């Protein structure tokens, strides 16, 4: 309906618009209207607003033109005026039909009205009923709130009564002394479990009574006397028991760890004394400290004394230094040496003492070693002594913390009260021994033993020995540095002319250094220390200078090089057995050995092939400077070199090989030198061939006498030594 009305209105406007256009066309420019059947009544026009009205009409028309029905009408070419009248007629018919339908349904509409009126009455009555019900619910809600308040008050009173009953029950239970407690404290032995249980109960009741007395509870006065008498009885029995255990430590041949373990089962006894009778607790603690302090001191003094009796009889003395010659101590009244001084500087199997298996091995038993006539170096005795000290100190510290209920500084103080005299005695003994000790390897091993024992103590969470380890290291490090300085000075002051006959074989002083340095380097690699590397660096510099001083005593350069190579090779070989390949010492001697080996090869090739070497170098220099024409004047010299090489090279190579094998003690090193010399000879001959291939010497008749280089290589391989 609405769409039809809209369409009708749009049609009317279009008809009016179309009519106006038709009039303009028929009238022409003069406005003649003879073509219209009926004049168009436009009414009075307001020419002042004509443009505004036309704009509105235009907008309205454009809007209606968008309607689908209008579009369809325009598309099919329908006469809009006729279509508008048709639509208007249809609207009138629809209106009349609607009126007839309304008249036919008038009775039903009246009946519906009556029903609505009846429903309104029913709803009004229901509203009244619901209002009454709401009023009743409000009164019930008030009653429920009242009951809730009463219930909450009753719950509060109940909880208060229960809390009071619980507090009173706890108070009464805490104050009442049961007969079982009295019987156990008075009659049961302290070792029975029920005595310990009732002692804990007594301690709890005494604490509860003290707390209630502080609050002013009058009932405490009724049980105070009973508790005091029971406390005195318990303290007396506990004191006698603990002191008896402490006195059992004093019996000869007693393993004091057994009574210590027994005391730990009753550690609550001391806690009871500490909380109820501090004077008795102090007495017990002082007695324990005094007893164990004497026991440890006596045990370690005896053990250290007996342990030193199984040390090697021969130890390093102040004259057993690296730079001291073997004949220095020999004299008419001197005692013959039972072992070589060189063993002082070798590690051998001594390094096993810091291995994990040996480090925590059982301690040495002196009387067993004496019966078996076994002897040990100082570091083994040091390890056994300090492992026993470490083990007992850790056990003692943990016992003190657990039994005497101490920790932190208090535990340290109590530990040093027990072990202080023993530790001081051990330090004095070590200081006395080091004053006359010249065995650097032993001292260095002792340093690493201490470093490892310190780590073990840290893992066991026993910091009480930290200060002792620092004191031991403060004794060992200066002595180690002093011994190294003495060895450095001995090498520095050694006069090669006083060492006897010269020999190109490795010198015993360099062998001592190699063994000594490799020993310290291998030990230091386990726990690196920069101070040790610095000291070894000083010693290495002095040994290198010493080797150069001894080499200078030889008259020929060849002998000097043989001596240097033999010593460098020996030191490098010994170092590589124990030290890492990339260590500073290994790299240094490797460079020295390579440099001297190359120089020796050149010195070795110089007598038989010196002329050839000189010519090749001169010719290559001329060619490089662009003066190759000067080679034409060297034809006679070249001819002599070709014929001389061809006639003597085999004998020269054979002599060279024999000379090398006689000069070097290390066959492998000699082999390497021979191979290097032959390789350099082949390279030299190859360079000689290249020089002769120059245009200036290419027509030389003697070139026909040249030995084929491949033939030379095959022949030289026959001289390669095999070992």
UniProtKB/Swiss-Prot annotation:
Q: Provide the positions where the record notes the PTM Phosphoserine.
A: 355
Main localization category: Golgi
Query: How is expression of this protein distributed across tissues?
Result: Ubiquitous.
Q: Which domain of life is it from?
A: Eukaryota
Q: Where in the cell is it found?
A: Golgi apparatus, trans-Golgi network membrane; Endosome membrane; Recycling endosome
Q: Could you name the Gene Ontology cellular component terms for this entry?
A: cytosol; EARP complex; endosome membrane; GARP complex; Golgi apparatus; membrane; perinuclear region of cytoplasm; postsynapse
One BP term from GO: protein transport
Keywords attached to this Swiss-Prot or TrEMBL record, sorted alphabetically, are:
Acetylation, Coiled coil, Endosome, Golgi apparatus, Membrane, Phosphoprotein, Protein transport, Transport
One of the entry's Gene Ontology molecular-function terms is: syntaxin binding
- Has UniProt tagged this entry with the keyword Protein transport? yes
Q: Which residues carry this modification: N-acetylalanine?
A: 2
The record's InterPro entries line, in alphabetical order, gives: Vps52 (IPR007258), Vps52_C (IPR048361), Vps52_CC (IPR048319)
Q: How does it sit in the membrane?
A: Peripheral membrane protein
Coiled-coil stretches are 107-127, 194-215
How does this protein assemble?
A: Component of the Golgi-associated retrograde protein (GARP) complex, also called VFT (VPS fifty-three) complex, composed of VPS51, VPS52, VPS53 and VPS54. Component of the endosome-associated retrograde protein (EARP) complex, composed of VPS51, VPS52, VPS53 and VPS50/Syndetin. The EARP complex interacts with EIPR1. EIPR1 interacts with GARP complex and mediates its recruitment to the trans-Golgi network. Interacts with RAB6A and STX10. Interacts with BLTP3B.
Family assignment from sequence similarity: Belongs to the VPS52 family.
Protein purpose:
Acts as a component of the GARP complex that is involved in retrograde transport from early and late endosomes to the trans-Golgi network (TGN). The GARP complex is required for the maintenance of the cycling of mannose 6-phosphate receptors between the TGN and endosomes, this cycling is necessary for proper lysosomal sorting of acid hydrolases such as CTSD. Acts as a component of the EARP complex that is involved in endocytic recycling. The EARP complex associates with Rab4-positive endosomes and promotes recycling of internalized transferrin receptor (TFRC) to the plasma membrane.
Q: Which PANTHER family match?
A: SUPPRESSOR OF ACTIN MUTATIONS 2/VACUOLAR PROTEIN SORTING 52, VACUOLAR PROTEIN SORTING-ASSOCIATED PROTEIN 52 HOMOLOG
Q: What is this protein called?
A: Vacuolar protein sorting-associated protein 52 homolog
Organism from which the protein derives:
Rattus norvegicus
Instruction: Output the lineage of the source organism.
Output: Eukaryota, Metazoa, Chordata, Craniata, Vertebrata
């Amino acid at each position: 309906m609405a769409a039809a009305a809209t369409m009708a209105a749009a049609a009317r406007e279009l008809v009016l618009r179309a009519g106006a256009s038709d009039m303009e066309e028929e009238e022409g420019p003069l406005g003649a209207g003879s073509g219209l059947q009926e004049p168009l009544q436009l009414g009075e026009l307001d020419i002042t607003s004509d443009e505004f009205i036309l704009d509105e009409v235009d907008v309205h028309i454009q809007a209606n033109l968008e309607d689908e029905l209008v579009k369809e009408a325009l598309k099919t070419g329908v006469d809009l005026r006729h279509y508008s009248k048709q639509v208007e007629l249809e609207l009138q018919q629809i209106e009349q039909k609607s009126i007839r339908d309304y008249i036919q349904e008038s009775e039903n509409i009246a009946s519906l009205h009556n029903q609505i009126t009846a429903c309104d009455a029913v709803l009004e009555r229901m509203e009244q009923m619901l209002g009454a019900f709401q009023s009743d619910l409000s009164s019930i809600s008030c009653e429920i709130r009242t009951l809730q308040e009463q219930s909450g008050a009753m719950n509060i009173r109940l909880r208060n009564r229960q809390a009071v009953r619980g507090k009173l029950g706890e108070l009464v239970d805490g104050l009442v002394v049961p007969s079982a407690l009295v019987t156990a404290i008075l009659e049961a032995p302290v070792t029975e479990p029920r005595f310990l249980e009732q002692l804990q109960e007594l301690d709890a009741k005494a604490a509860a009574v003290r707390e209630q007395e502080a609050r002013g509870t009058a009932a405490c006065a009724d049980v105070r006397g009973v508790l005091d008498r029971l406390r005195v009885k318990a303290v007396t029995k506990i004191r006698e028991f603990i002191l008896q255990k402490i006195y059992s430590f004093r019996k000869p041949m007693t393993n004091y760890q057994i009574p210590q373990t027994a005391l730990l089962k009753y550690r609550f006894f001391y806690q009871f004394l500490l909380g109820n009778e501090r004077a008795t607790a102090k007495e017990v603690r002082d007695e324990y400290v005094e007893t164990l302090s004497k026991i440890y001191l006596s045990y370690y003094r005896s053990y250290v004394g007996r342990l030193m009796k199984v040390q090697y009889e021969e130890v390093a003395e102040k004259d057993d230094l690296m730079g001291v010659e073997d004949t220095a101590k020999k004299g008419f009244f001197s005692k013959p040496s039972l072992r070589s001084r060189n063993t002082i500087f070798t590690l051998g199997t001594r390094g096993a003492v810091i291995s994990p298996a040996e480090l925590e091995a059982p301690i040495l038993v002196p009387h067993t070693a004496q019966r078996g006539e076994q002897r040990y170096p100082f570091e083994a005795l040091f390890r056994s002594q300090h492992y026993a000290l470490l083990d007992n100190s850790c056990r003692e510290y943990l016992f003190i913390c657990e039994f005497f209920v101490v920790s932190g500084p208090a535990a340290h103080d109590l530990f040093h009260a027990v072990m202080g005299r023993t530790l001081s005695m051990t330090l004095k003994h070590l200081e006395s021994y080091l004053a006359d000790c010249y065995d650097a390897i032993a001292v260095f091993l002792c340093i690493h033993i201490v470093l490892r024992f310190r780590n073990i103590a840290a893992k066991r969470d026993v910091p009480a020995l930290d200060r002792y380890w620092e004191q031991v290291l403060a004794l060992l490090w200066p002595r180690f540095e002093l011994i190294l300085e003495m060895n450095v000075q001995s090498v520095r002051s050694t006069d090669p002319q006083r060492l006897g006959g010269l020999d190109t074989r490795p010198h015993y002083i360099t062998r001592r250094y190699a063994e000594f340095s490799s020993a310290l380097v291998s030990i230091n690699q386990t726990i690196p220390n920069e101070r040790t590397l610095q000291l070894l660096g000083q010693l290495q510099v002095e040994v290198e200078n010493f080797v150069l001083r001894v080499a200078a005593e030889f008259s020929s350069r060849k002998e000097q090089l043989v001596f240097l190579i033999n010593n460098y090779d020996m030191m490098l070989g010994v170092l590589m057995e124990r030290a890492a390949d990339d260590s500073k010492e290994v790299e240094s001697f490797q460079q020295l050995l390579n440099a001297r080996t190359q120089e020796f090869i050149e010195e070795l090739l110089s007598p038989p092939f010196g002329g050839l070497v000189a010519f090749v170098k001169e010719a290559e220099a001329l060619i490089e400077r662009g003066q190759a024409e000067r080679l034409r004047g060297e034809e006679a010299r070249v001819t002599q070199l070709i014929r001389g090489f061809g006639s003597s090279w085999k004998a020269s190579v054979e002599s060279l090989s024999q000379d090398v094998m006689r000069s070097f003690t290390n066959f492998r090193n000699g082999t390497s030198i021979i191979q290097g010399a032959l390789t350099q000879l082949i390279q030299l001959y190859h360079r000689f061939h290249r020089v002769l291939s120059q245009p200036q010497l290419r027509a030389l008749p003697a070139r026909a006498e040249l030995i084929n280089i491949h033939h030379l290589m095959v022949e030289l391989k026959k001289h390669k030594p095999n070992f």
